[in-house]
């Protein structure tokens, strides 16, 4: 059996176009994340001092921010990180990483988001670090959220809502989520920095983010969920 040459030509042409589109998409996304990372640097640069402690979130946009922050590391004291991944990147840049227990104040917390509503309510936790992110955000004087414009939404809920759970409670929590109208999906082969599991919740009504954040966190076995309604950012910077 021999495939006609013309068929092969159109197949490879189609594959080439598809790969070019993917390449251009990721190039544009990278440019957007670099753009908003620079905006965050511009926002905090003149407010930095040798006593300043930054809070650093987790995720691809934050990674770009850390890269940009490298040039300013002598202008501030150090950082409290929300994940082991971010801590590692900060140390690679020779930025001192502190435990939250060892600092009196965090001046600015910089982090991304999976969704941002018009009221600055967030969904976070795509990287599974939302529990520590929420803790560090709550300890900061000012929360600066940095996102590309695709993350701005009219209503939260298109992105699955991450819920961190104690491993032994995963099934019982999932049943409670079903009773609330959600569709729980166990995030396989993933363990949080705290040694817990993640349930990603689809199809749940988040029209009242504050109420749902409380409701989910009151389920026995839930550590925290990815709604940031009570710890929402004071500032949201969006890519051009």
What is the predicted role of each segment?
Residues 44-52:
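Short helix-loop-beta connector
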Residues 14-18:
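Cationic, low-complexity basic patches in intrinsically disordered or flexible, solvent-exposed regions
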Residues 53-61:
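Glycine-rich beta-strand-to-loop/alpha-helix junction loops that act as flexible
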Residues 51-54, 72-79, 121:
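Short active-site oxyanion
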Residues 67-75, 83-92:
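Active-site histidine-anchored catalytic micro-motif
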Residues 31-34, 46, 84-240:
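Conserved phosphate- and dinucleotide-binding cores of soluble alpha/beta proteins
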């Amino acid at each position: 059996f021999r495939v006609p040459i013309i068929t092969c030509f159109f197949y490879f042409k189609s594959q080439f176009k598809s790969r070019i589109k993917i390449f251009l998409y990721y190039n544009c996304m990278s440019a957007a994340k670099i753009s908003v990372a620079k905006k965050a640097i511009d926002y905090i640069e003149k407010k930095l001092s040798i006593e300043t402690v930054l809070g650093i979130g987790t995720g691809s946009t934050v990674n770009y921010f850390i890269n940009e922050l490298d040039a300013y590391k002598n202008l501030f004291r150090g950082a409290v990180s929300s994940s082991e991944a971010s801590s590692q990147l900060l140390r690679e840049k020779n930025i001192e990483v502190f435990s939250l227990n060892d600092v009196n104040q965090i001046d600015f917390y910089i982090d991304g988001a999976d969704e941002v509503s018009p009221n600055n309510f967030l969904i976070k936790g795509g990287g599974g670090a939302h529990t520590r992110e929420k803790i560090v955000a709550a300890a900061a004087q000012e929360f600066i959220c940095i996102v590309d414009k695709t993350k701005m939404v009219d209503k939260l809920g298109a992105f699955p809502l991450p819920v961190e759970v104690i491993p032994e409670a995963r099934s019982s929590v999932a049943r409670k989520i079903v009773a609330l109208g959600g569709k729980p999906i166990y995030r396989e082969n993933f363990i949080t920095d705290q040694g817990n599991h993640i349930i990603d919740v689809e199809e749940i009504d988040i029209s009242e983010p504050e109420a749902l954040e409380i409701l989910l966190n009151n389920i026995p076995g839930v550590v925290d969920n990815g709604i940031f309604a009570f710890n929402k950012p004071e500032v949201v910077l969006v890519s051009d």
